[in-house]
Each structure stands twice: as C-alpha cells, then as structure tokens.
From Swiss-Prot:
Protein task: Catalyzes a reversible aldol reaction between acetaldehyde and D-glyceraldehyde 3-phosphate to generate 2-deoxy-D-ribose 5-phosphate.
Family, similarity comment: Belongs to the DeoC/FbaB aldolase family. DeoC type 1 subfamily.
Protein name, UniProt field: Deoxyribose-phosphate aldolase
Pfam family, one: DeoC
Pathway per the UniProt entry: Carbohydrate degradation; 2-deoxy-D-ribose 1-phosphate degradation; D-glyceraldehyde 3-phosphate and acetaldehyde from 2-deoxy-alpha-D-ribose 1-phosphate: step 2/2
GO function term, MF aspect, one: deoxyribose-phosphate aldolase activity
Keyword field: Cytoplasm, Lyase, Schiff base
Catalytic residues identified in the record: D93 (proton donor/acceptor), K159 (schiff-base intermediate with acetaldehyde), K188 (proton donor/acceptor)
C-alpha cells in the first residue's frame, strides 16, 4: 500500500477554473504547505503570486501552457512557457496541437512540443515539462503516437487530460501511456481523481503524478465533488 505521505508528494494541487481569485490561490498554497503536496498548479497569470507565497517552501509552482485547447501557435506557447519560468514556474504542463495530431501532421506536433521544452529548459534546465495529450479526444493509436512524440521532443512527463475536455484519466489510458513511454518519461493522471481510492488506482496503473483539485479530500480519505 502506498503511504499517504508518498501520495501527497505525487499530487499537483490544482486550481485552473476561470473564476479563481487571489484569495483562492492563497488558500491553495496554504493547503499545499499543510499537506506537503508536490506542487500547486495554477494558470499563468497567478504564477508570480504563487511563487511569492511558496518561496520559503519546497513546494513547486506548476502552470499550464496553451491551455486548455492546445490551439495557440507554437511561438505563443514557447513565449508563455519562457515567461512562466522567468516568473517562478518550475513545472509546465503544455497541451499538444490536438488537431495536428489527428490530421497526421506529426512533425508539426513534434516541433510544437520541442519549442516549449527548449523555451522552458532554456530558462531553467531543471524545469519539468509535462505534455497533455487530452486522451478523451484520441484513439489508442493516437495516444501512443502522442506519447512517442512527447518523448522524442524531450518531455519529462506525458499527461492524460486538461480536466476541461469530455473526460479525464482512466486506468486503461494510464496503463497504455506507461507501456508506451516505459522508463523514458513519467505519466501524470489528471481529471476525475476525486478520492484516495481513485489515486491508488492511477498509481497502480503507472502514474507517478496526479493532477487534482481534490487533494485535500484525497488526503482526508473523503470523496470530493470537484470536477478536475
């Protein structure tokens, strides 16, 4: 059985909704300190604020790039990543160009990821880059290809979902993604992880990071009504 301490260090404590306020971000950071979560995941505009709140802690600031559709230009994604790292982000979760992947334009998808990896790690080589493939929109073949491209581009993690699509992480998808990347990358499960039991299932399937807005409920052994 995985200990609750170990699970806490796998959680990206997440708040990405449009209505999040500075007070909400402050609460998120306080909870992260209380439960010793791995990171807080916030929208880019809140990165400087969260970085300031967490500057004397071990908790990282994670943010999202090209979120949630992945449909901004590569240049914009690269700038967004660079700006976020300059302002204190130590982890960036980027969304792939889903339409390009589905159209078989793999070189485009690869370059998109590469540019973000380069922009982020160019500012700070220790930055962790996670690639959101948005599994709910992909066939198994597309999921495999997306994972392969992420690894080729130098990403550290592949991530299931934004939490804003039609579905979140499933045990089957986490297994498939882990099988595909092997030891070359890690897997982050996100979307719909609302309980301690959900967390354990994802970890057993191969996830080493969990994106959830239900971190506190998970640690308290409750079931949360949160969507992400």
């Amino acid at each position: 059985m995985v200990s609750s301490t170990k699970i806490a260090q796998m959680i990206d404590h997440t708040l990405l909704k449009a209505t999040a306020t500075y007070a909400d971000i402050e609460k998120l950071c306080q909870e992260a300190k209380e439960f010793n979560f791995k990171s807080v995941c916030v929208n880019p505009a809140f990165v400087p604020f969260a970085s300031q709140l967490l500057k004397d802690s071990e908790i990282k600031v994670c943010t999202v790039i090209g979120f949630p559709l992945g449909a901004t230009s590569t240049a914009v994604k690269a700038y967004e990543a660079s700006w976020a790292v300059e302002n204190g982000a130590l982890e960036v979760d980027m969304v792939i160009n889903i339409g390009a992947l589905k159209a078989g334009r793999y070189e485009e998808v690869l370059e998109d990821i590469k540019e973000v990896v380069s922009a982020a790690k160019g500012k700070n080589p220790t930055v962790v880059v996670k690639v959101i493939i948005e599994t709910c929109y992909l066939t198994d073949e597309e999921k495999i290809k997306a994972c392969e491209l992420a690894v080729e581009a130098g990403a550290d993690f592949v991530k299931t979902s934004t939490g804003f699509g039609t579905g979140g992480a499933t045990v089957e998808d986490v297994r498939l993604m882990k099988r595909t990347v092997g030891e070359k990358a890690e897997v982050k499960a996100s979307g719909g992880i609302r309980s301690f039991a959900d967390a354990i299932k994802m970890i057993e399937a191969g996830a080493t990071r969990l994106g959830t807005s239900s971190g506190v409920s998970i640690m308290q052994g409750l079931v949360s009504g949160e969507d992400y």
